Swiss-Prot record:
Obligatory cofactor(s): heme b
InterPro entries xrefs: Catalase_peroxidase (IPR000763), Haem_peroxidase (IPR002016), Haem_peroxidase_sf (IPR010255), Peroxidases_AS (IPR019794), Peroxidases_heam-ligand_BS (IPR019793)
The organism's place on the tree of life at top rank: Bacteria
UniProt EC number: 1.11.1.21
GO MF, any single term: metal ion binding
Record-listed cross-link Tryptophyl-tyrosyl-methioninium (Trp-Tyr) (with M-243), residues: 95-217
Stated family: Belongs to the peroxidase family. Peroxidase/catalase subfamily.
Protein name: Catalase-peroxidase
GO cellular component: cytosol
SUPFAM superfamilies noted in UniProt: Heme-dependent peroxidases
Length: 732
């Protein structure tokens, strides 16, 4: 609800000072692999034997909520509660924890508790949320590892709402904490509140959702501080859509959130001290120390506006809409100099946060007035105004979606307050309703699949396309559900719709003819298993690829097609694919690393998968780029051997992004390649990995490592399985 909109706008968010120059300083264009090694076990103080879900199951949630409810009205002298209630502060904390989520790549959100780390803990829009986290510390300290910070942020927001008379939709635990900042692209700007992310007619760059560096959503004063409600509505619609909210959900969230609390702009924002990451050691991670008055309470400065929306800011009500429509609004400025709106011809009716004897005039933000003056938002707002119960239900559902959107399927939800109702945005999959196939069935089905006339490339590419939609960021996608046969995935260019239809038709026929029920989702993955075992055997290595049945097939009615559109790859370096119809905002090799990170792969896993998929002939469109073998369909290490040989000289071809590998002696073209292929020979770290697999004694290691990485991708969305290392079993 609060936001900094004009103070310190030119300050660089990167700390400066004498420091040794690293590789990125010398070679800024060097491909960065560090995102593949985030969440390292070595950074986790709890160790590999700690399982958060098991700890959460021992939590006394009722007692925890009672403690949180008591905290809401236990005002502290070092940061007094507005209106004697911390509800508005904790709603904002939870909202801003979840509100970084973006649909384009599924990153951000509340799932990892990243708000306590840089840069989020120091974003202008998160000013003074450090105080909310410190207020929570005694409770976190009391309950220890039974509740993660990530879960506690969301739960505190829920309890805040409930303590002020609102009935929430539910709460699910299960967000395990991370222990270091995630390396994530938040924008190209080098200053807080910069907006270089726009081009043309205010076209917001992908994958970003917020309008300016350091904001969660939009500038509350209007686009770039311009108090234009209609312009603000355009920004709101764009940025809320990018975090998976439609118009109705957007109105419900803004109006519902702004039913409570206030913004803080009591004085000159230039009197604020540095953000937490910019403070001195004695500040102990508390930022934004203010020299204005007492620095807190009635003198608090969080951002520019000083707005109170409701006559009862610690109680669920319809006052927001009542004020929005009852009054005409006049542009004014806050004590901090920010643009905001005050009710015309009104009597003071909203309470002062610290002096019960005082009343103020109702006030609104430019982004609030967008809900009245945008014709689409106005229609929804008026309906909610006239139907308070409908508004309450819409806000409850939208709040639940906001705070749970990046948790993935309901199978990951924990606790007694998980809603019984299944929601479409949760990507529901039917429960297993049949006896699963056994080992003998698996072998029989593999034989039938290999005898169906489908090639190794057909089976591998179909299984890969089905499973590789998985995003570890928001736990969406994956092979479970077999949504590759449904709209929109069945029509994606990368999936080669005609070939896909043929493969699926044959697999479905095999399933129908088999004596036991088996899902198409399982058959798709099993087809890949059978193909890889055959390809490895043809390379002289006997291996049994792990397979775990238990996937089910989702229906089209269980699939929100528009919400799956962002999962369509702009590029898939694993299959040497670039979608020419989509804007590419990364180099091909950067897109490969980005996709590998979403698949939760390490650099070695990414390397071995690319090398294996190339020789298996799994390229999109049957492209020959990077197929450095004379035996396609055989799981050999030829890709690495032929890439690293000095017998080949590489040079650009006449086609952009395509390279020719010529025999150094004859000049004959032997291979063609993309940037994704050649990066494994040009990048020193990737070359070191490629060398491992090109060595003469790595024949079996290559196959085993490929199978392990492949199985990891196939099972990425199997939250019903216990996460254990993939153990390879030699075939008989």
């Amino acid at each position: 609800m609060d936001a900094k909109t004009d103070d310190k706008a030119g300050k660089c968010p990167v700390a400066h000072g004498p420091a040794p120059r690293g590789n990125r300083d010398w070679w800024p264009e060097q491909l960065n692999l560090s995102m593949l090694h985030q969440r390292s076990p070595s950074a986790d103080p709890l160790g590999k034997d700690f399982h958060y879900a098991e700890q959460f199951k021992t939590l006394d949630l009722k007692a925890l909520k009672q403690d949180l409810t008591a905290l809401m009205t236990e005002s502290q002298d070092w940061w007094p509660a507005d209106f004697g209630h911390y509800g508005g502060l904790f709603i904002r904390m939870a909202w801003h924890s979840a509100g970084t989520y973006r649909t384009t790549d599924g990153r951000g959100g509340a799932g990892a508790g990243q708000q306590r780390f840089a840069p989020l803990n120091s974003w202008p829009d998160n000013a003074n949320l450090d105080k909310a986290r410190r207020l929570l510390w005694p409770i976190k300290q009391k309950y220890g590892q039974k509740i993660s910070w990530a879960d506690l942020y969301v739960l505190a927001g829920n309890v805040a709402l409930e303590s002020m008379g609102f009935q929430t939709f539910g709460f699910a635990g299960g967000r395990a904490d991370t222990w270091e900042p995630e390396e994530l692209f938040w924008g190209p700007e080098g200053t807080w509140l910069g907006d270089e992310r726009y081009s043309g007619e205010r076209q917001l760059a992908d994958p970003l959702g917020a309008v300016q560096m350091g904001l969660i959503y939009v500038n509350p004063e209007g686009p770039n501080g311009n108090p234009d409600p209609l312009g603000s509505a355009k920004d709101i619609r764009e940025t809320f859509a990018r975090m998976a909210m439609n118009d109705e959900e957007t109105v419900a969230l803004i109006a519902g959130g702004h039913t409570f609390g206030k913004t803080h702009g009591a004085g000159d924002p230039s009197l604020l001290g540095p953000e937490p990451e910019g403070g001195d050691v004695e500040d102990q991670g508390l930022g934004w120390k203010s020299k204005y008055g007492t620095g807190f309470g009635a003198d608090a400065i969080t951002g520019g506006p000083e707005v109170i929306w409701s006559q009862e800011p610690t109680k669920w009500s319809n006052h927001f809409f009542d004020n929005l429509f009852k009054f005409e609004w006049e542009l004014t400025k806050s004590p901090a100099g920010a643009q905001q709106w005050v009710a015309k011809n009104a009597e003071p009716s909203v309470p002062d946060p610290f002096d019960p004897s005082k009343k103020r005039l109702p006030t609104m933000l430019t982004s609030d007035l967008a809900l009245r003056f945008d014709p689409i938002y106005e229609k929804i707002s008026r309906r909610f105004y006239e139907n308070p119960d409908e508004f309450a239900d819409a806000f409850a559902r939208a709040w639940f979606k906001l705070t749970h959107r990046d948790m993935g399927p309901v199978a990951r939800y924990l606790g007694p307050e998980v809603p019984k109702e299944t929601l479409l945005w949760q990507d529901p999959i039917p429960p297993v309703d049949h006896e699963l196939i056994n080992d003998a069935d698996v072998e029989a089905l593999k034989a039938k699949i290999l005898g169906s006339g489908l090639s190794v490339a057909d089976l591998v590419s179909t299984a890969w396309n089905s499973a590789s939609t998985f995003r570890g960021s928001d736990k969406r996608g994956g092979a479970n559900g077999a949504r590759i046969r449904l709209a929109p995935q069945k029509d994606w260019e990368v999936n080669q719709p005609e070939q896909l239809a043929t493969v699926l038709q044959k697999l479905e026929a095999i399933g129908k003819e088999f004596g036991k029920k088996v899902s198409l989702a399982d058959l798709i993955v099993l087809g890949g298993v059978a193909a890889i075992e055959k390809a490895a055997k043809d390379a002289g290595v006997a291996v049994k690829v792990p397979f775990s049945p238990g996937r089910m097939d989702a229906s089209q009615e269980q699939t929100d097609a528009p919400s799956f559109a962002p999962l369509e790859p702009r590029a898939d370096g694993f299959r040497n694919y670039i979608n020419s119809k989509k804007h590419q905002f990364m180099k091909p090799e950067e897109a490969l690393v980005d996709r590998a990170q979403l698949l939760t792969l390490t650099a070695p896993e990414m390397t071995v998968l690319v090398g294996g998929l190339r020789v298996l002939g799994a390229n999109a469109g049957d492209s020959k780029h990077g197929v450095f073998t004379t035996k396609p369909g055989t799981l050999s290490n030829d890709f690495f051997v032929n890439l690293l040989t000095m017998a080949t000289s590489w040079q650009p071809s006449g086609t952009e992004g395509i390279y020719e590998g010529r025999d150094r002696k004859s000049g004959e073209v032997k291979w063609t390649a993309t940037r994704v292929d050649l990066i494994f020979g040009s990048h020193s770290q990737l070359r070191a990995l490629a060398e491992v697999y090109a060595q003469a004694d790595s024949k079996e290691k290559f196959v085993n490592d490929f199978v392990a990485a492949w199985t990891k991708v196939m099972n990425a969305d199997r939250f019903d399985l216990i996460a254990e290392p993939v153990l390879l079993e030699a075939a008989e």
